[in-house]
Amino acid sequence: MQLFGVKVSAFYRFCSIIPARLSNFAANYIILYMIDTTIFQNKKAVYYTLGCKLNFAETSTVGKMLKEAGVRTVRPGEKADICIVNTCSVTEVADKKCRQAIHRLVKNHPGAFVVVMGCYAQLKPEQVADIEGVDLVLGAEQKGDLMKYLGNLEKHAHGEAVTTAVKDIRTFVPSCSRGDRTRYFLKVQDGCDYFCSYCTIPFARGRSRNGKIADLVEQARQVAEEGGKEIVLTGVNIGDFGKTTGETFFSLVQALDKVEGIERYRISSIEPNLLTDEIIAFVAQSKRFMPHFHIPLQSGCDEVLKLMRRRYDTQLFASKVHTIKSYMPDAFIGVDVIVGTRGETPEYFEKAYEFIQGLDVTQLHVFSYSERPGTQALKIDYVVSPEDKHVRSQRLLVLSEEKTHAFYARHIGQEATVLVEHAKAGMPMHGFTPNYIRVELEQDEALDNQMVRVRLGDFNADGTALQGTLM
């Protein structure tokens, strides 16, 4: 029997790809783009993801779709029929890594149908399509419609690019990934309306948009049913949640907190001006949301923050750190910092360094500024040399190590609950405390994905974790 020219069995199989109660977008493309999935039977795919956790979540969704259509992931040594590359374009180095990854996959999997998606694909689709071996380039609006564009998997003489103007990118594609770790990454928001002077992400991912709270809660319940215990909320600008649904990030946090079976939530990264005292107070009293924050600072100098077109100053940032610590003295606070941006004079850097040095934060994620075409930052005259960028970066990395070491050392001798993660071959068993201290444990596969009480001992050999003893 056929329905709209498609085998009914294939139609039902394709319907099963989409979890219940997801977005209208998902429901619509089932109806509009029903396909005969028998062309995917016995096919093998390889997936390569670059960049942020959001990308990994989206790749996982693509993988689930292909798996339900009959495609399995390649095993070591096998050749793939389909190569999926999810790209990043946050820096010039990221662009280069994307090209290298594509070349490597084309070489290692001759004859495979190569699909490239992600930020680099949206920003430079024709450049990506020109890479030898690439068959299909999908923009931000199209990647959720992968099944529609795969066709019959025949190689193209030249790559086909299908993208949408950034102003027309409006679809929210639900995504959730597990990967090799115990924790899951749940995409709650996409896109950004901030247009900072140095950043191309709004041009790569479009305007801010989000899923519905009811749908996201349902995804969290599904994670719990699969045995998942920890979820990290991910997005481009998650504090801006609610633009498309009239809801708020605080309401989302409250709703997720009620999902039974999930032991831990972490907020991946949230802008300081969107991290409200209300959210901080809620996390402090919640048994499920962990005392762990990641807040992008980018610069500790107000003059540079203005050049960056950031929406806060150092006084506001310091007040957020103070509020967190007043509620949760042992909270882990990670901070993003960019060094060497245009306009960052030696005096401005020293001012920033002094401010960061005085902050009660745990870890710095240090990035060297990379010039991106089309950004407003290129209009700023003062340029920092690569040598100075390196020196400044190293100083902040040393400062970060000092802060992290002091934070860990303060907890030696204490008891804590650790969620044990799956150990990679040849690596020690490890897990994390509620406030994100990495703890190494004696090898015991029975502990995988288990919550255990440990006593925190001294540092491990390389100083990257504390040694834990089971209570």
Regions found by a protein language model. Name each.
Residues V46, K379-M471:
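Terminal RNA-binding accessory module
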Residues L3:
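Cationic, low-complexity basic patches in intrinsically disordered or flexible, solvent-exposed regions
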